[in-house]
Amino acid sequence: MPYVGPGINDNGSGTAGTLAIALHISRLLRQTNYAENMRSRLKFCWWGGEEMGLLGSTDFVRRAKADGSLKKYSVNLNFDMIGSPNFLFGIYDGKTADNTTTPVRALPGSNRITRLFIEYFEKQRLPWDYMGFSGRSDYGPFLAEGIACGGLFTGADEMKTQEQRDRYLRMLGPALSGMARAILDPCYHRSCDTMENLNQFAYLHMVKAAAYSIDYLAKLQNLNQWLYP
């Protein structure tokens, strides 16, 4: 049975953040010459049934594969839970993709997307951490079809280690470093996942990192060559 709760961080945060980016790009396209620099089309999607087994994204991929349109999609970026209260600036690590279920062609691009997100956080002088490419979110069906994927994740029921807390303390200060040996989102799948559960600082920077990556990829002259060398 799916859990019952407000779902503000999981996954209202990623849903709203993606919508904010889509609206901002829409304004840029209408009011500026932004389109002149775009080399790829963007499609913003919100999937249903993730908690019940990635139902929405799986159905989309199945239908797109059946009608031949799946080949139009070069990359999938996934933003699921990006405002956890005891957050990590988590980046999906392409190197941890399951080699038994992931086509080889998806790996170089997925690793490059990982580096792209790292680039943002290092430019902003922010800490970051690798997150496992577990397939538990809606990028999974795309990755399984050989499409390069990447994304951001501030954490769910994982624990923040002492090393992580100390590193965040050095870079962010005591107010933003969180607690060691504590769950990243103690309200994960619980009724307390309300607006008060959202870490606004983490959320802001995760949305900015998402926007940075989308903008970069959309403007690449040869996106497919970059993803699939």
Label each PLM-derived region with a short phrase.
Residues 1-54, 210-213:
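Alpha-helical metal-binding/catalytic segments enriched in His/Glu/Asp
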Residues 37, 47-184:
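Metal-dependent peptidase/peptidase-like ectodomains
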Residues 16-19, 23, 27, 58, ...:
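Solvent-exposed, polar/charged alpha-helical surfaces in well-ordered, non-transmembrane soluble domains
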Residues 9, 61, 83, 129, ...:
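Generic, ordered loop/turn and secondary-structure boundary motif
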Residues 40, 159-229:
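His/Asp/Glu-rich mid-to-C-terminal helical/loop segments that flank catalytic regions of hydrolases
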Residues 8-15, 50-54, 106-110, 114, ...:
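Solvent-exposed, acidic/flexible segments
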